[in-house]
Amino acid sequence: MSYFPWLTILVVLPIFAGSLIFFLPHKGNKIVRWYTISICLLEFLLMTYAFCYHFQLEDPLIQLKEDYKWIDVFDFHWRLGIDGLSLGSILLTGFITTLATLAAWPITRNSRLFYFLMLAMYSGQIGLFSSRDLLLFFIMWELELIPVYLLLSMWGGKRRLYSATKFILYTAGGSIFFLIGVLGMGLYGSNEPGLDLERLINQSYPATLEILLYFGFLIAYAVKLPIIPLHTWLPDTHGEAHYSTCMLLAGILLKMGAYGLIRINMELLPHAHYLFSPWLVIIGAIQIIYAALTSLGQRNFKKRIAYSSVSHMGFIIIGIGSITNIGLNGAILQILSHGFIGATLFFLAGTASDRMRLVYLEELGGISIPMPKIFTMFSSFSMASLALPGMSGFVAELVVFFGLITSPKFLLMPKALITFVMAIGMILTPIYLLSMLRQMFYGYKLFNVPNANFVDSGPRELFILICIFLPVIGIGIYPDFVLSLSVDRVEALLSNYYPK
């Protein structure tokens, strides 16, 4: 047990401080903006301090544990704790949310509510990544939906209500299966229902029940990740949402599904995961190709980037399905790498479309001349997304490749076939990204329009872009910085699959 409640403070601080926004003096938006950014920054500094001085990397066990009785009637506890799996995701959440808050600077309509919802999301995400009770995990999973729905439906494009409704229907539908799985786990095999993850790790289930529970959880994660065919909410949502909301969706929300798949399905249901893993790898390989081909056919450049996200999630699914030390570490690396790259591409797409008031590629062209800074950063992050050596995307995809090749679970022919499919997906990625860059930035179409007055990136936007570019390069050059966080925990987790 930790003597100081670091994690409780990290979970409660954003939503509590966010609720005070409504009591700030009504003297324009500047006070609200600076207050929100200060809270995000304070939270990020607190978590960095707590993890630097109170977390031992070489210890694969759960650390900074907290356990408080919450509801007496059915023994429900507020249980928090972190390990190497959740550490990277929590730091990513703090980093991206702070920069997304800074990205939301131009928001003036209902700005108090907007910033409160962003802080409420922050609490939900930190709570999910640090919860050690399955019911608390589910509550945090659901807490996320309300702010996202409101952010989508109130700030965005013309079809924002349609995309917000589609998002809530998909995620609420997945949550029903999640809740059934939670209840099934809690009520099985004991007179007193308990959902402590420490106890559930040692719980064994009949084969049929374990497969049903696994499948129920998988549907919920398949919506969030997303896994095809439950992905269609994502392009609509990213096409309509404000770019600061897109940063949170692409950077953190999609990663919650991957985290749940590792934390719940792999850790608590190892036998079912061992059975399902070949199917996960096949689905991941199909997803890489399918989403890349679909992305190539998109006229709206925001939707093209959204489908590229779906394609990159395929590598995470393959890494999780490979059941190897290398593959799972590669999946965790890809979670963080895509968190940085995906969030930035949506930020760049949003800022560019705000300036041009255009999103269709055939209407664009020649904007590299009036907007050289946006062009440079867009090109740099597109290169990171297509896995250019020296950037985080390359290392993550390469490690997942090696994880699949070294997996003892698969025979040589299936390995060769899936590797071939992944390679085709990696070839398609530069095709759709570079063709998007060519259509947007090269040529003379918009440059020759009379009275066209395009403004390049300002200091605030450049600061956000450089802040994210540094870790992308850093992870690409020295991936061990991230892998060292999770390597011991991954080894402990996989000991359930391959006992020594």
UniProtKB/Swiss-Prot annotation:
**Which keywords are on file for this protein?**
Chloroplast, Membrane, NAD, NADP, Plastid, Plastoquinone, Quinone, Thylakoid, Translocase, Transmembrane, Transmembrane helix
- Superkingdom to which the source organism belongs: Eukaryota
Enzyme Commission number(s) of this protein: 7.1.1.-
Q: Which residues form a coiled coil?
A: none
Report any Pfam family annotated for this entry.
Proton_antipo_M
InterPro entries membership: NADH_Q_OxRdtase_chain4, NADH_Q_OxRdtase_chainM/4, NADH_UbQ_OxRdtase, ND/Mrp_TM
Membrane topology field: Multi-pass membrane protein
Catalytically driven reaction(s): a plastoquinone + NADH + (n+1) H(+)(in) = a plastoquinol + NAD(+) + n H(+)(out); a plastoquinone + NADPH + (n+1) H(+)(in) = a plastoquinol + NADP(+) + n H(+)(out)
Location comes to: Plastid, Chloroplast thylakoid membrane
Q: Which residues cross the membrane?
A: 4-24, 37-57, 87-107, 113-130, 134-154, 167-187, 211-231, 242-262, 274-294, 313-333, 334-354, 386-406, 417-437, 462-482
GO terms, biological process: ATP synthesis coupled electron transport; electron transport coupled proton transport
GO molecular-function terms, A-Z: NADH dehydrogenase (ubiquinone) activity; ubiquinone binding
Q: Name one GO cellular component term.
A: chloroplast thylakoid membrane
NCBIfam families the record matches: NDH_I_M
Q: Which family does it belong to?
A: Belongs to the complex I subunit 4 family.
Protein name, entry field: NAD(P)H-quinone oxidoreductase chain 4, chloroplastic
Q: Which organism is it from?
A: Hordeum vulgare (Barley)
